[in-house]
């Protein structure tokens, strides 16, 4: 394929046509009876003048009225500009078929999910009425895109609010001393735990012994003058002894630590330390 040359540069191309071998160049002094020999590839005449399209195979000439094929060219020849135009049209159509249309379809599916599945936060229900569906179908593309963008922005706002709420909850869990509600809840838990830990081992043993002891006979009843013997009846622990047992690390009545069988009671300070270790 050759490249077309501008018409302005070759307006007088017929004056410089190549001459065949053995022919003399044009001379104004030639007699009128002798006709000059002209090359067959050159057209002389102002009315027949045409733009010269240089091609190595001499396949095309471009005139002011259109395209004119050379007499020696075959009928299956084509023009470069027409080929380029058709190729460009084909490329554009391929882009529309394979890129633009699938993208538009995917965007339309997302918009339909937002509008029809109730993602735009309608409190009445998840399904829209048929009238609203028809109204959405009749909307132009600009309004659909606007509603789609509004739905996406709304979803982003909802997600951001949810994440901020989660982050605030995490901060409250990491720093429970800053929240008064957490302190009240911890105090309630401490009181419940202390109430559950009050019935200790000796008191339970006393109740078992009281249920298992036989009923006293009338012969064994003490006389009114004699004081009742308290040798076999265990005495309940005094309040001071109970208070000492509640404190962690407190000594017993003899100054020693708690026996291994007794259940040590927990105070508020130890519970607070356990909560801090758990949260950290």
UniProtKB/Swiss-Prot annotation:
Pfam families for this protein: FAM131 (PF15010)
Disordered: annotated segments: 195-280
InterPro entries (UniProt xref): FAM131
Comp. bias (Pro residues): 215-227
Polar residues compositional bias, start-end: 197-211
The family this protein is said to belong to: Belongs to the FAM131 family.
Name this protein carries in UniProt: Protein FAM131C
Species per Swiss-Prot/TrEMBL record: Homo sapiens (Human)
